[in-house]
């Protein structure tokens, strides 16, 4: 898998407890509190996307904090930009937490 073949989606990208300057990508209304890697992977699976989970990877800006461990590599598809993909993943995680 070459570097250009996938987007990296970090747990921190959809975490409502994190500021945008520290790595959150989506608006706070779409973000969820402390998302798990499993929730994000399940959302990617629900969208029918190919991905690889990497639970040991640490966010580069927060390599020393255990709260920010884990990311998934999502293979690129023409239907999404990285930002729109992360928004869609956040929506799915948020709705699954509500039970819907």
From Swiss-Prot:
Protein keywords: Cytoplasm, Ribonucleoprotein, RNA-binding, Signal recognition particle
GO biological process, one term: SRP-dependent cotranslational protein targeting to membrane, signal sequence recognition
Entry-linked InterPro entries: Signal_recog_particle_SRP19, SRP19-like_sf, SRP19_arc-type
Record's subcellular location: Cytoplasm
Keyword Cytoplasm: yes
Signal peptide: none
Primary subcellular site in the record, as a coarse category: cytoplasm
One term of GO molecular function: 7S RNA binding
Short name of any one Pfam family annotated for the protein: SRP19
GO cellular component, one term: signal recognition particle
Highest taxon above the source species: Archaea
Stored PANTHER family: SIGNAL RECOGNITION PARTICLE 19 KD PROTEIN, SIGNAL RECOGNITION PARTICLE 19 KDA PROTEIN
Description of how the protein assembles with itself and partners: Part of the signal recognition particle protein translocation system, which is composed of SRP and FtsY. Archaeal SRP consists of a 7S RNA molecule of 300 nucleotides and two protein subunits: SRP54 and SRP19.
Assigned protein family: Belongs to the SRP19 family.
Function: Involved in targeting and insertion of nascent membrane proteins into the cytoplasmic membrane. Binds directly to 7S RNA and mediates binding of the 54 kDa subunit of the SRP.
HAMAP family recorded: SRP19
Listed name of the protein: Signal recognition particle 19 kDa protein
Record gene name: srp19
């Amino acid at each position: 898998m070459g570097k250009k073949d996938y987007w990296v989606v970090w747990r921190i990208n959809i975490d409502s407890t994190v500021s945008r300057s520290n790595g959150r990508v989506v608006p706070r209304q779409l973000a969820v509190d402390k998302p798990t890697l499993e929730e994000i992977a399940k959302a990617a699976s629900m969208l029918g996307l190919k991905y690889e989970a990497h639970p040991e990877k640490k966010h580069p800006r927060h390599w020393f904090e255990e709260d920010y461990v884990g990311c998934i590599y999502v293979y690129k598809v023409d239907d999404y930009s990285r930002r729109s993909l992360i928004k869609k993943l956040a929506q799915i995680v948020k709705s699954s937490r509500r039970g819907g």
